[in-house]
Regions:
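AMP-forming adenylation/ATP pyrophosphatase catalytic core
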Residues: 123-129, 138-355
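ATP-dependent adenylation/nucleotidyltransferase module used to activate substrates
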Residues: 1-154, 173-175, 257
Length: 355
């Protein structure tokens, strides 16, 4: 079904059963939309959690008198997100599964169901906004800096952004919680906020990787200093990350991880090397505003999606055939392959990439 034939008053809302999607449903209904809730049943280490979430979402839908559906996407989620997560770590990278899930699994699933249901709009409870500039939609930071989730949605395409609604983008988490209490949703208002990787169920990611892939999937190798001198052995790159000092198994506890050399399957350590960098190059990136020739594009750069990590001012430059040169005005600490890096002009997301 093409978007031109979809009802402008119907919206497909992703519902997890938690506070944010519950209040998004309420706000959309109060705004006059005909809301259809969809719970995506993703793969989880503890399958019962997903059943509980679906039941909570259904209960909310019944309370609001809106339609509710469940879509089972466990197989595709396992392949594209969980297996990717494990594979990247085993290669010595630091992946962000949310940045993988949103453009590849979650939003395409919402879009598919929206088309099937005749919904012009798709919505979620993310704390972000959007803005139309020069006939192009851009993602924008949420009004509450402490809950802004734009870092995790930087790679949504134009079709999705054009149809997306973000009812919570202008609100703070505290205000949403207050409104939930005032509107009879005490259960979700006091519900503990979920943190971390959704499918780990609180398990350490290293234990999870072994659990999913077995010890035989790990490649033991050498721990070396920056000159290549062998200092010890490791049981797999997945057990290490840049800056790590504990758990190296070396007699001298002054060493820390400088980088993970996946091509040689080595953990490189040092006692004195700096983990700060002023420049990186990206081959896997997207920009809505491309610098031309020698022109530098001034941006604010976010490396991690945690609200306590501020953006760093910097510049972008296209270097052919290498890709995108990212220069930081102030050195950034501990950048590792696999991380997402997002670029902003003021509060507007203009692109991003994978280190």
């Amino acid at each position: 079904m093409r978007s031109q034939s979809l009802s402008k008053t119907k919206v497909l809302l992703g519902m997890s059963g938690g506070l944010d999607s519950t209040m998004a449903a309420l706000f959309l209904k109060e705004a006059g939309y005909s809301v259809i809730g969809l719970t995506l049943k993703t793969w989880h280490r503890n399958p019962g959690i997903m059943e509980q979430n679906a039941a909570k979402a259904k209960e909310t839908a019944e309370k609001l008198a809106i339609e509710h559906h469940v879509m089972d996407i466990q197989k595709s989620f396992k392949k594209e997100v969980v297996d990717y997560f494990c594979r990247e770590y085993m290669m010595g990278k630091t992946p962000n599964p949310c940045n993988r899930c949103n453009p590849v699994i979650k939003w395409p699933a919402l879009l598919q169901k929206a088309d099937e249901s005749g919904c012009r709009h798709i919505a979620t409870g993310h704390y972000v906004r959007k803005q139309l500039l020069n006939n192009r939609w851009y993602l924008k930071k949420g009004a509450d800096p402490s809950k802004d989730q734009s870092y995790f949605l930087w790679n949504l395409n134009q079709e999705i952004l054009q149809r997306a609604l973000f009812p919570l983008g202008q609100l703070s988490k505290e205000k949403v919680r207050e409104l939930a209490l005032n509107n009879g949703f005490q259960d979700v208002a006091v519900q503990k906020e979920s943190m971390g990787v959704c499918f780990l169920d609180g398990t350490d990611y290293r234990d999870f990787i072994v659990e999913q892939n077995g010890f035989t999937s790990l490649r033991p190798g050498n721990i070396v200093d920056e000159t290549g001198r062998i200092l010890g052995k490791h049981r797999g790159l997945a057990f290490f990350t840049t800056g790590q000092k504990k758990g190296l198994g070396l007699p001298d506890n002054k060493y820390f991880v400088v980088r993970l050399d996946s091509s040689n399957n080595q953990v490189v350590v040092s006692k004195s090397a700096s983990l700060k960098t002023s420049k990186i190059y990206l081959s896997n990136y997207y920009l809505s505003a491309l610098p031309s020739g020698k022109e530098l594009l001034e941006v604010d750069i976010r490396i991690r999606g945690i609200d306590t990590v501020p953006t760093i001012p910097g510049t972008l430059k296209i270097i052919q055939p290498i890709g995108l040169e990212v220069n930081f005005d102030h050195p950034a600490w501990g950048i590792t392959p696999g991380q997402s890096i997002v670029f902003y002009r003021d509060d507007v997301v203009i692109g991003g990439g994978i280190v």
